[in-house]
Amino acid sequence: DSGVIVYANSNFVNDTDASYFAALPFYFNGVDDSVDLSDAWISVMYAEFTGTSLSGASTSDFSRKGNPCGSAKEWCLVVDDTSIAAAGWVDSSNVSQYSIMGGSSMGAPQVSGMVALLSQAFPSHTPAQLTDRLLASANNAWFSPSGNTTFTTHGASIKHGYNNEWGHGVPDLEA
């Protein structure tokens, strides 16, 4: 009840489902009186956006570089995290320095930062409300949804589409 969990999905493009850990709420909700993890859980998928603008984009403008959202589709976001400058080990020389990296582990901190910005803008929001706000405002105009989630934590019913591959889509903090 005190935070949002942002989990990096795996980077195995040939897998057909989200990693087990990225989809934990799918496997444990309601099991043996477990907590509903999906209330404040976001899985981050690794993709590359090759278009020039999300306005008018289509699925052909995205290249999935990791696992699909799959079982985590109802709380999954897509982030282009192919060229992120990060500190880390570059080679076997044990020298740490900034390098350009990619992967869902580079996208999860981006989404965590978005949650932090939303919590600053909406300090009275619960973790579930912050999660719902981010998922419900994601840009999904570039794919065909296969299902809908109805978000009700803000007092109104807001439907937002998702699909098995792309989850809810790309986060849109300006929405």
Residue ranges, per PLM feature:
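C-terminal subdomain of the subtilisin-like protease fold in secreted/lumenal serine endopeptidases
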Residues: 40-43, 120-175
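Active-site neighborhood of phospho(di)ester-bond hydrolases with catalytic His/Asp-centered motifs
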Residues: 6-10, 44
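Extracellular S/T/G-rich loop segment that most often corresponds to the catalytic His/Ser-adjacent loop
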Residues: 25-116, 120
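Metal-dependent catalytic neighborhoods of phosphoester/phosphodiester hydrolases
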Residues: 18-23
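Residue-level detector of functionally special positions within alpha-helical transmembrane segments
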Residues: 10, 103-105, 167, 172
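Extracytoplasmic, non-cytosolic globular domains
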Residues: 12, 105-114, 129, 134
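Acidic glycine-/aspartate-rich tracts in secreted/extracellular proteins
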Residues: 10-13, 48-50, 139-142
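A short helix->loop->beta-strand "cap" motif at the edges of active sites that frequently abuts
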Residues: 2-4, 39
